[in-house]
From Swiss-Prot:
The gene is espE. This is ESX-1 secretion-associated protein EspE. It is a single-pass membrane protein. Residues 391-402 have a biased composition (Polar residues). InterPro entries: ESX-1_EspA/EspE-like. It is found in: Cell inner membrane. One of its GO terms (biological process) is biological process involved in interaction with host. Its main location: membrane. Residues 346-365 have a biased composition (Low complexity).
Amino acid sequence: MASGSGLCKTTSNFIWGQLLLLGEGIPDPGDIFNTGSSLFKQISDKMGLAIPGTNWIGQAAEAYLNQNIAQQLRAQVMGDLDKLTGNMISNQAKYVSDTRDVLRAMKKMIDGVYKVCKGLEKIPLLGHLWSWELAIPMSGIAMAVVGGALLYLTIMTLMNATNLRGILGRLIEMLTTLPKFPGLPGLPSLPDIIDGLWPPKLPDIPIPGLPDIPGLPDFKWPPTPGSPLFPDLPSFPGFPGFPEFPAIPGFPALPGLPSIPNLFPGLPGLGDLLPGVGDLGKLPTWTELAALPDFLGGFAGLPSLGFGNLLSFASLPTVGQVTATMGQLQQLVAAGGGPSQLASMGSQQAQLISSQAQQGGQQHATLVSDKKEDEEGVAEAERAPIDAGTAASQRGQEGTVL
């Protein structure tokens, strides 16, 4: 026999099942990403100290400087992306924890109502009626609160998933600026890696065929679309068939979503009878959700489920800094500091060093035969770097050519 206590028990079991789906234990706050963010910041600061001195001149030195600055910017981007990811995981952990607290409170409340209903059902005549009168509204309140909390968690999780796609897009954009040296073996591109991971490919398992038994219809796997054919079925002459119905007219082809045809033209619609009803089906936007008041904010002992943190990816903190850094990185790579130029500069400098070594050997033979002239002209033969001092400023600024 159905009773109010049975309704409370069913409601409590449903809430308990939802708690199981939310998991147990403390959610991961994402501290590992915060640690990675600080590590990338330290790497960026160390790379800023690796810039060559002012006495390094030449195209190779400029290409090296550009590559060093580009690597520093990449480290900054990775640190900012780790910080964004850590904040997102921390927020998601808070959303899950708050939703659990709400569901536990509702389960505790409905368990108390269950005990009261059990006591009322022992009263003869009106006991079951009083039990129903108490169980129905309390179970309805509990289910409404649980549904609102789960809807809140769904919306906030959807927002985090959308923002995570934005972070992944920035990461892929940064990986496309990595140097590709011609002498190194080819590495798989990022699209090839993604295609190999998703969608997952099932192993090709051969399915043995069925034995060929005379009289049985052919069996093919996988099945082909269409109705199966069963041969040698008896036919009944004169048996009436199904009547042929005329073609049902299709829905009118309108841009956007399809609409139901107007079966009764001229009659007023629901929107005409009740103004404002037509706007009920419109889904709220992110901005409208963020402006909603906090859910359960006025109940003591329950966490406040608010949509104030409902921000788009462009509105998140640190995203503007990531966008600016990515712009600098792309401009630096496009300005000529690319890896191909760095490799060509390296080959040119190798040839220059080889030619200078040959010239140095010839000059060494001349200096041995005429040591006195070499000592007299040593002051004129020396070349100081740019930061050598006053003598360098008098002869003109010359530096170490790379």
